Swiss-Prot record:
The modification Phosphoserine is found at residues 411, 416. The keyword Transport does not apply. It comes from Rattus norvegicus (Rat). Monomer. Forms a complex with RARG and the SRA1 RNA in the nucleus. GO terms for biological process: mRNA processing; mRNA pseudouridine synthesis; positive regulation of transcription by RNA polymerase II; RNA splicing; tRNA pseudouridine synthesis. This is Pseudouridylate synthase 1 homolog. GO terms for cellular component: cytoplasm; mitochondrion; nucleolus; nucleoplasm; nucleus; transcription regulator complex. Residues 57-68 have a biased composition (Basic and acidic residues).
């Protein structure tokens, strides 16, 4: 076909196509017959990027988020799993653990969660449902019990100056002393290998009953301190502690607990009264266990109970074991040795040893925990009152209802449930 004939064919085709009725829309096929074409949109689309047409936003204005035209959308910070090192004086609190729906009983976690929300670390709804931030504490310290090294794990937004902002919303007797990143599945209670508690008491508790002294003049002798440490050392190892709690029977496997160490430190004087601190480290403790361990040693040293009662208390028979007052019990620190061995040197996570925070821990104890124990002991004399109940106990035979034998001493700091990190 020559060029003239090809050109004529193209002109004829063009004439037939342009003669069809109705407006044409680029990109749409021509309309057949006299059908009315679809109406075009009343606005012109905005072309964005390469290819495709993006239509203008048609959402009703009332549904749009209010704000300036140039306002940027809110940032979404990723949540990170962390642990917080806490110290607190438990006076006036009903323990560590939060009890939702029971606002009349104020707990340490009530104040902590409120501070986390106000600081902008967690959303407000996480405060009412703590599972949303995977919250867990190492130990449930009880009513009036203090802590110098409590550790909690949770997910938060890692905002700038996070420790300062949290502490700014906490009372002075509750402090966050440290923060570390941990693995995503970390659970502070389950990953804790051991817990160390201390029990601070006036040394006149060890004065023999035949020359009992309950005033500021008593000073603990080196011989008596040696006897105390010999008896406390008997607790080391694995024993059946069913007589040291009201929760377990003699044949329950969970009544067997492993004690790594227990000893009494050198005495010191506060406000004219001599005190000593007993430290105990164990894998875990049952309700009232530490207070009963201290109570039985005091009863032996004072001459109310024979030393043989220790061996008997680990047998299946029921033994009358006195429970020392809750005042003086402090959660000293928690240990994560297996976690540190696995993750502490992997280059991604820090070991949970808190060595750098040791100075702050000591300062907090000296400023808030020890003064509270000393002043309360002087005002309420809880140890002196409890010592007067020791003659009531029967240490020679099988105990029946021994837990209720007039040994309860009321105190604003007495732990309602004892040592707190029960199963």
């Amino acid at each position: 076909m020559g060029f003239p004939r090809l050109w004529a064919a193209l002109l004829r085709a063009w004439g037939r196509w342009t003669a069809r009725p109705g407006p044409r829309v680029p990109g749409l096929p021509p309309m057949a017959g006299n059908k009315v074409p679809p109406a075009l949109p009343s606005h012109q689309p905005d072309r964005k990027g390469r290819g495709g047409w993006v239509w203008e936003e048609t959402e009703h204005p009332a549904k749009r988020v209010k704000g300036g035209e140039d306002e940027e959308p809110p940032r979404k910070l990723p949540k990170r799993k962390i642990v917080l090192l806490m110290a607190y004086s438990g006076k006036g609190y009903h323990g560590m653990q939060r009890n939702l729906g029971s606002s009349q009983f104020r707990t340490i976690e009530d104040d902590l969660v409120s501070a986390l929300v106000q600081a902008g670390c967690i959303p407000e709804n996480h405060g009412t449902d703590m599972r949303k931030m995977s919250f867990q504490r190492c130990a449930r310290t009880d009513k009036g019990v203090s802590a110098a090294g409590q550790v909690v794990s949770l997910k938060v937004w890692l905002i700038d100056d996070i420790l300062d902002k949290i502490n700014s919303h906490l009372p002075s007797h509750i402090r966050i002393l440290g923060l570390k990143r941990v693995t995503g599945g970390f659970n502070s209670k389950n990953k804790c290998d051991a817990r160390t508690y201390c029990y601070m008491l006036p040394t006149f508790a060890f004065a023999h009953k035949d020359r009992d002294v309950q005033d500021e003049s008593y000073r603990l002798s080196a011989e008596t301190l040696q006897q105390v440490n010999r008896l406390l050392g008997c607790y080391k190892g694995t024993h059946n502690f069913h007589n040291f709690t009201s929760q377990k029977g003699p044949r329950e496997p969970s009544a067997r607990r492993y004690i790594l160490e227990m000893y009494c430190e050198e005495p010191f004087v506060r406000e004219g009264l001599e005190f000593a601190v007993i430290k105990v480290k164990g894998q875990s403790f049952m309700m009232h266990q530490i207070r009963k361990m201290v109570g039985l040693v005091v009863a032996i040293v004072k001459g109310y109970a024979p030393e043989s009662v220790l061996e008997r208390s680990w047998g299946e028979e029921k033994v009358d074991v006195p429970k020392a007052p809750g005042l003086g019990l402090v959660l000293e620190r928690v240990h994560f040795e297996k976690y540190n061995q696995r993750f502490g040197s992997d280059g991604l996570h820090e070991p949970l040893d808190w060595a750098q925070e040791e100075g702050k821990v000591t300062a907090f104890k000296e400023q808030y925990i020890y003064p509270t124990i000393v002043s309360t002991e002087r005002d309420e004399r809880s140890m002196a009152q409890w010592l007067n109940t020791l003659p009531i106990h029967n240490f020679s035979g099988t105990a029946l209802g021994a837990d209720d034998t007039g040994a309860k001493v009321p105190s604003s700091l007495e732990g309602s449930e004892g040592d707190g990190d029960t199963d």
